Structures are given as structure tokens and as C-alpha cells.
């Protein structure tokens, strides 16, 4: 209970500061709408269905890119953690790609995959792949050697060692990797939708900026923040 109360203290203070600034008119209402005006706009977007429509599309993109990274990163992390020879082949290219920010590769991704959904999924995939891969790899690699010796003494096959010993030992690291990957998926979604999209929360923010609707921009930003905080 105490942790929960501490968690809402800072957001409450920020909203209070926002209210005071808007009440004192330090900035014009055009530049910084009040919390009440923003809440009214959010209600209108919910009633019209526009907010749900854009949110659903954004959720689908995050889910698609995240699931693709899980399908690729988990087995690749397990293989690299178990096999030094396999790791020696994969590690140089993975180490190179790891230091390339996904948003920096957006022009090349758009050139290769166009501006449809494929490019957005690739951006989210690249952002969420390495946290899960590296945590899976370190979890498998860090398995207690004594447990592996026990498996060998019981004549476990390589598959049995991975399934019965290494995977259970790596589960905490994999869980952390999944959480980090999901957070990075949301961060990458913001860049992907702001640059090349005709729908989604990022598109709604960009369209509102062009239409001079800072209240809608704030609703979209708060929605991004709340979704990321939930993860």
C-alpha cells in the first residue's frame, strides 16, 4: 500500500503543477491547455470512438513487433547460450546491429519495406529484440555448472538439459527481458508512428499538431505515458 501511494505522489504533483501553471496563465491556453480542458477533449475522443480506433491499431503494432522478437530472440538466445560455436558465428553481426539505434535506421527501413505496416513492425522488432536476446543468453550462460554436471551424470540429452535445467534456471532473466522488450516496443512505436503512419496514437498526435490542437497532442502523450507505465 505504501509503495502504491508513493507511486502516485509524483504524477499527482505534476498534475497539480500543470493546474497551477494554467490557472496563473504563465503560458497561453493555446500552448498549454488546462487539465480540465484536456480531460474534456479526452472524453470527446472516447465518445467519438477515434481514441479507441487509434489505440487499437497501436496495440496491434506493438503486439506484432513484440511477438516477432519473442519468436526470434528466445531460441537464438538459447542457442547462443548453449553453443559456443554457434555463438561465434552469430555474435559479430549481432554485436554490430545492437549498437545501431532502430530510429536511426528508419530511412533505410522505409526504403526496404515501404511505409506500410511492415516497416513499423521491423522498427518495433529491432527495438525489442536485443533486451530479450541478451537476457535469455545471459540466463542460459549463467546456469549453475553443478546442475549441468548432474544432468550429464544422469545421461540427459542436450534437449533434456536445456528443457529441464537451463530454461528453468534462466526464467528470471527471461522474464526481465520480456518486460524490457515490451517497454522498448512502446518507445519504438512512438518514433515509427510519428514518422510514417496514417493511423495510430502517433499519427493522431502529429495530425493534431498540424491542426493546432495541443489538447489532443496532450491526450496522445498522456496515453503513451500511461501505457508505458503499465508495462
What are these regions (language model features)?
Residues 9, 13-17, 52, 56-80, ...:
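Hydrophobic alpha-helical transmembrane segments of multipass integral membrane proteins
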Residues 111, 140, 187-219, 223:
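Glycine-rich helix-loop "coupling/hinge" segments at transmembrane-helix boundaries
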Residues 1, 24-67:
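Periplasmic/extracellular loop-to-transmembrane helix junction in inner-membrane transport proteins
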Residues 122, 126, 159-190, 218:
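Transmembrane alpha-helices
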Residues 135, 139-177:
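Short cytoplasmic-facing helical segments at TM-TM junctions of multi-pass membrane proteins
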Amino acid at each position: 500500500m505504501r509503495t502504491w501511494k508513493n507511486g502516485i505522489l509524483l504524477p499527482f504533483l505534476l498534475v497539480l503543477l500543470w493546474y497551477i501553471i494554467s490557472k496563473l496563465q504563465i503560458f497561453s491556453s493555446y500552448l498549454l491547455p488546462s487539465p480540465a480542458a484536456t480531460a474534456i477533449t479526452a472524453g470527446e475522443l472516447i465518445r467519438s470512438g477515434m481514441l479507441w480506433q487509434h489505440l487499437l491499431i497501436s496495440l496491434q503494432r506493438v503486439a506484432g513487433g513484440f511477438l516477432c522478437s519473442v519468436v526470434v530472440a528466445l531460441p537464438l538466445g538459447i542457442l547462443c547460450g548453449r553453443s559456443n560455436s554457434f555463438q561465434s558465428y552469430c555474435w559479430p553481426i549481432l554485436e554490430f546491429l545492437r549498437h545501431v539505434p532502430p530510429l536511426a535506421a528508419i530511412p533505410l527501413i522505409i526504403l526496404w519495406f515501404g511505409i506500410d505496416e511492415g516497416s513499423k513492425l521491423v522498427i518495433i522488432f529491432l527495438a525489442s529484440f536485443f533486451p530479450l536476446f541478451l537476457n535469455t543468453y545471459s540466463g542460459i550462460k549463467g546456469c549453475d555448472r553443478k546442475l549441468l554436471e548432474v544432468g550429464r551424470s544422469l545421461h540427459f540429452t542436450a534437449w533434456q538439459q536445456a528443457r529441464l535445467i537451463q530454461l528453468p534456471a534462466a526464467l528470471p532473466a527471461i522474464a526481465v527481458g520480456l518486460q524490457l522488450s515490451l517497454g522498448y516496443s512502446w518507445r519504438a512505436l512512438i518514433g515509427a508512428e510519428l514518422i510514417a503512419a496514417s493511423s495510430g496514437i502517433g499519427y493522431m498526435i502529429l495530425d493534431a499538431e498540424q491542426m493546432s490542437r495541443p489538447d489532443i497532442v496532450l491526450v496522445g502523450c498522456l496515453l503513451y505515458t500511461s501505457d508505458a507505465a503499465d508495462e
